[in-house]
Amino acid sequence: MTYEEGPGDAYFAVDPAHRGLLPEMVDHALTHLRHDGKVRLMVSDWDRDLQRIVHSRGLRATDGRDGNSVLDLTEPLEYAAPDGYRVISLADDGDAHGFNRLLWRGFGHPGDAPETPEQLEWRRLSMTGGPGQVPELNIAVVAPDGEYAAYCGVWHDPRTDYALVEPVCTDPDHRLRGCGRAAVLEALRRCAARGATTAYVGSNQLFYYAMGFAPYETGTWWV
């Protein structure tokens, strides 16, 4: 059981051999993961046992959903970068300023990206310094003017046969040109070369379906 950005949201992962822990995990989330007195639980729509447990604790399903999609990496992963754009890895060019600007703009923040020493150091760590980070797998698409246009981060442990796509963004000035597609598929090509046969992304956006991802599993927020 964990949360992503802070207490208030709870996600569950349990080994099939230890599903008897689920009631205790739910109770722990309800007691210890609240924020301002509130907590919501992400429950897989396929997990009837967990649904029954959270329902018995007085929670009810909402219309808030969380989709996931899957891609077969044994199939060809074809893309073409837009004319004048280059596809690189963060091992080739670790421009923290450009990376910071892209993620700021790509995820819809207004104005200029903050460039305090603390912000840039955090970006540097998120580019190459995190546990499990493989800079050669994390792909940026560079525009003709040298600015980062799109980015795809992926996570792959060579002891496993799957990859996780996260995060992905494109600068608003470079959308609808194939930059995001190029970043994602190049990153996944590299994962496939390391032995990954499947890729997952926590999204059900048409952007992913257009490159071959298919709906895999959905979850619902319970409160």
List where the protein language model places each region.
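A structural microfeature
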Residues: 1-2, 62-65, 150, 180, ...
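A conserved beta-strand-loop-helix scaffold within acyl/acetyltransferase catalytic domains
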Residues: 2-7, 110-169
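Acyl-donor-binding surface of acyltransferase catalytic domains
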Residues: 5-85, 89-91, 221-223
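Conserved acetyl-CoA-binding loop-helix of GNAT-fold acetyltransferases
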Residues: 19-31, 170-172, 176-193, 210
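Conserved hydrophobic beta-strand within the GNAT/NAT acetyltransferase core sheet
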Residues: 39-42, 165, 198-203
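Conserved active-site tyrosine of GNAT-family acetyltransferases
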Residues: 52-55, 208-209, 213
